[in-house]
Amino acid sequence: MGSWIPKLLLLQLVLLLTKHADSSSIIKYLPGFEGPLPFELETGYIGVGDEDEDQMFYYFIKSESNPEEDPLLVWLSGGPGCSSFTGLVYENGPLGFKVEAYNGSIPTLVSTTYSWTKVANIIYLDQPVGAGFSYSRNPFADRPSDTGSAKLVNEFVRKWLAKHPDYFSNPFYVTGNSYSGKVIPAIVQEISNGNYICCKPQINLQGYVIGNPVAYYDHDKDSRIPFAHGVALISDELFESLKRSCGGSYSIVDPLNTECLKLIKDYHKCVSGIYQELILKPKCETTSPDCYTYRYLLSIYWANNEIVRRALKVVEGSKGKWERCDLSVRSNQDIKSSIPYHMNNSIKGYRSLVISGDHDMTIPFLGTQAWIRSLNYSITEKWRPWMILDQVAGYTKTYANKMTLATVKGGGHTLEYKPEENSILFKRWISGQPL
């Protein structure tokens, strides 16, 4: 008799969560922010997958300029498993945390200066299922895959637009960074195929924006050693020995190649004290308020507060501890390379902007340049600096297939390290201006 109790409780939980499918709420106040929000925020869930069992949580922020005509973006954070709230409060959203020692109260939110929502409507989407506040009503669901996530994001966007039909005609872009940069080209392909095969009205798909994106992860990682040499983190002698012994392949090494393995250990000793997401910043303990990464803890304190969850209209019981980047969200990484998707999307005429912070050692700009070269696109504008107030902000190159590469001088793995430069870069590109 007692063995039925856990099953009964599980059934009750599933029935409880089922009642909350496909909901949305307008949020005028957020805990931690003083006064009413100075922008329009909506949160909610859209059910996708078999019988809508996967409930995708989103934050939608209207453009502060002209929401009826400004572009509509869906933003996906990396990981896989990072909540899109990361993008909202740390990268390109209208809110950020006041960085101060946590005292047990709700962390303070403040307005930001360089939000992309000044010129665009943005849906910050928690994906894959399990990231952020997204959840599955099926406790036995298979772990998500890259291609599966691409299909579900396509389904999410179509269902979201069906509930927000005023945005069907807005120019639509898929945006994100890091690991999501590998999946985004596949999402663009899914949406494009849906437009041609099945679905009316069509989504006004125009292109995509990816920041320090994973393309072919092993090759991306291989570029770390040449990058480290280029910025004087390893010696000429070690670099030449690595090239000679490893043949340029540093992430997948023959276990019998003991000389290469030994040299890679020497390399790791040299860079172990480096903060790889932005090598200019110190590597330090996250628990110290003086450490840059301390700000990430504030989002964890904030999102795990019950008052906050009620304000966001998070379904009660749908999520245990919220993690900014939940490493337990393990995905089947079945897209080994995004390059075929880039090529297919360019043939269809979609625009793309590839942003690369030039001091990121996680996905170095050298690897990004290498996979772009492999596309064999003809160059329409040669490598040149792009400027802000007569100062070099980075370098750019434009290709015939509507792809633009832009580095950000002094930038890191994500947009947050150079918010002004990334905001100006995005505004110029999205409006069709020269960088």
Swiss-Prot record:
Disulfide bridge positions per record: 82-325, 246-260, 284-291
Subcellular location: Secreted
Primary location group: secreted
Pfam families assigned to the protein according to its UniProt record, in alphabetical order: Peptidase_S10 (PF00450)
Entry's Gene Ontology BP terms: proteolysis
Tissues showing expression: Expressed in senescent leaves.
Enzyme Commission numbers on file: 3.4.16.-
Residues the record marks as carrying a glycan: 103, 344, 376
GO cellular component: extracellular region
Signal sequence bounds: 1-23
Top-level lineage group: Eukaryota
Catalytic residues identified in the record: 178, 360, 413
Gene Ontology molecular function: serine-type carboxypeptidase activity
PANTHER family, per the entry: SERINE CARBOXYPEPTIDASE-LIKE 14-RELATED (PTHR11802:SF316), SERINE PROTEASE FAMILY S10 SERINE CARBOXYPEPTIDASE (PTHR11802)
The protein, known as: Serine carboxypeptidase-like 14
Organism whose genome encodes this protein: Arabidopsis thaliana (Mouse-ear cress)
Annotated gene: SCPL14
